[in-house]
Amino acid sequence: MGHAEWIGRTNTAVARSAVGKWFRLEGSGHPRERKGAYFFTELRAGLATFFAMAYIISVNANITSDTGATCVCPAEDLETHCNNNTEYLLCKQEVNRDIVTATAAIASVASFFLGLLANLPVALAPGMGLNAYFAYTVVGHHGSGLIPYSLAVTAVFVEGWIFLGLTMLGIRQWLARAIPASIKLATGAGIGLYLTLIGLSYSAGLGLVQGAQDSPIQLAGCASDEFDSDGLCPSYAKMRNPTMWIGIFCGGFFTVFLMMYRVKGAVIAGILLVSIISWPRTTPVTYFPHTTEGDSMFDFFKKVVTFHPIQHTLVAQDWNISSNGGQFGLALITFLYVDILDATGTLYSMAKFAGAMDERTQDFEGSAMAYTVDAICISIGSLFGSPPVTAFVESGAGISEGGKTGLTSCMTGICFFIAVFFAPIFASIPPWATGSTLVIVGSMMMHATLEINWRYMGDAIPAFLTISVMPFTYSIADGLIAGIISYILINGGVWVIAKCTGGRIVPPNRDDEHEAWTWKIPGGFFPPWLVRAVHGKKDFWRADDEASQLDLGVMPPNGSMSSGSPEQVAEKAVGKY
């Protein structure tokens, strides 16, 4: 038996098993089996998704540990004192290792169960943008932000359960649709610029820019031990930091070239290249200097494969919010709103990419279960000490490899589970290795600006304010507030003037170029499962049969792949693989 024949027979055998029927693989005999869904193709797609998003393990750990989490640093002169406090820095290292384990663990659980229960080829992990807002606005560098870390993870925990309630009642879909399209598109672009600024800064990036005295920001690029008494980079040392240049060329341009040639795992390849260059202790770019902190990091790195239990960030919630109620509420609302936009937008786009979208209702197969898993995993992740979990657009890498079912996500989840035991490697990835990654991710998120309606000022100005205010205030919440309020004031004012003048005074291009907006949702306000339950359908969690008549990428009951001899089915399976 040749290799191709063995693959075909295995695809056929798995398709006809209970696993194949559960995931609706082609050839399973399921009345709604998915075209082109084969066992080995799904596994390969899951690997592609993992390598496309594995960078989140180290990036999320670097960003989140910048808060100090539960490590205590004296309040006086936070920046100077904390950066030179050996005990505090050693504690931060432990937090970084905790978050590495937490990120891999929650990504494993969330991705596996979303694939198993929702049967979608979409992976979940702590979200980029949300983790930056969590770390640098809500908690702050060294805990200098709005609320302590313990309250921040409490807000994330509560947000997850609120998200679950909104999902079950259908309000989640209404909120996502009620926000004007220009604001939703601008939110993604604004977060992209926000991530870019983080990637260029010192805390979790290349160290190319920093704050200044005479201007909001200035060029930097010098080693941290060359800062002057004001903590600024002197002119004679600018752009002389070798770690910055390694990050730019090996982590930036090298990664871009790989991406241009569609090399799988390009992002993680760039990160690993910079990391490998930075690991030897005898070079000027080493991540393990001969100091107390460097020795501690190197000792952990040498373990290579080990399980690091979560210690500092496990169940760190503090339920006494009396002294920070206002800021706690603001953080909670922002987490909830951004998560609704992020998860909804990503899941919708990935479902459409996979061919599982109902254009009439703007819903997709398994949507209720997908959002339920996402919401529950947000709360579980907060117990590990992680920022909110969300769907990753990198799931498109797996879908482009042929992933069509939840088996793809299950494979990605298994890969993240294996990564839990490689914490020493992921915890030893320096920030300059991931800085260019943040810039690249930010540039990809700017693609959303192409769809913004720039022709009408009532749409363009709120969108522009949303995009620009986010990075300049270092806050996603402030950008959203600026965009929404300006949209209400501008378009509300136009509406009032039109009403008062009987429609005689309106902008000349309003009717032709203003984007359509309505709070009404095609297909009804309530989620399909609730409608089915009210109508007395016993298995209300199952989609109606007429969905199979839509072009959703599923086979009709008499699909050609569910008939024929095993040899014919195997031959077709090999061809698709």
From Swiss-Prot:
Membrane topology, as annotated: Multi-pass membrane protein
Coiled coil ranges: none
Role summary: Efflux pump; part of the gene cluster that mediates the biosynthesis of notoamide, a fungal indole alkaloid that belongs to a family of natural products containing a characteristic bicyclo[2.2.2]diazaoctane core.
Protein name as it appears in the record: Efflux pump notK'
GO cellular component: plasma membrane
Keywords: Cell membrane, Glycoprotein, Membrane, Transmembrane, Transmembrane helix, Transport
Organism in which the protein naturally occurs: Aspergillus versicolor
Region (Disordered): 555-577
Assigned protein family: Belongs to the nucleobase:cation symporter-2 (NCS2) (TC 2.A.40) family. Azg-like subfamily.
Extent of Low complexity compositional bias: 555-566
Pfam families on file: Xan_ur_permease
Taxonomic lineage of the native organism: Eukaryota, Fungi, Dikarya, Ascomycota, Pezizomycotina
Keyword Repressor: no
Single annotated GO MF: purine nucleobase transmembrane transporter activity
Record bears the keyword Cell division: no
Biotechnology: Notoamides have been shown to exhibit antitumoral activities. Notoamides A-C show moderate cytotoxicity against HeLa and L1210 cells with IC(50) values in the range of 22-52 mg/ml, but the IC(50) value of notoamide D is greater than 100 mg/ml. Moreover, notoamide C induces G2/M-cell cycle arrest at a concentration of 6.3 mg/ml.
Glycan-bearing residues: 62, 84, 320, 558
